[in-house]
């Protein structure tokens, strides 16, 4: 029981710790937002093609 408050305090401190990613960007780094947008676009294309069939050609976006 004595360790419970210490454990809770440690759990609260973990998210506020400095991140390892907090380093200056170099010219070769890609922003995470760009990677997120690319993944979102790829998933959207996959979703559109998943429901595509010859009977529903109007839904296909090639």
Curated annotation (Swiss-Prot):
Bridged cysteine pairs (disulfide): none
InterPro entries given for it? Answer: T-conotoxin
Species this protein is from: Conus litteratus
Q: Name one Pfam family in it.
A: Chi-conotoxin
A molecular-function term among this protein's GO annotations: toxin activity
Regarding how it is modified after translation, the entry says: Contains 2 disulfide bonds that can be either 'C1-C3, C2-C4' or 'C1-C4, C2-C3', since these disulfide connectivities have been observed for conotoxins with cysteine framework V (for examples, see AC P0DQQ7 and AC P81755).
- Protein name (database record): Conotoxin Lt5.3
Q: What cellular-component terms does GO give this entry?
A: extracellular region
Q: Does the keyword Disulfide bond apply?
A: yes
Primary location: secreted
């Amino acid at each position: 029981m004595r360790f419970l408050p210490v454990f809770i305090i440690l759990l609260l401190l973990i998210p506020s710790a400095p991140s390892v990613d907090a380093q200056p960007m170099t010219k070769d780094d890609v922003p995470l937002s760009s990677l997120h947008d690319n993944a979102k676009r790829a998933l959207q294309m996959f979703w559109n093609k998943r429901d595509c069939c010859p009977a529903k050609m109007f839904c296909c976006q090639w």
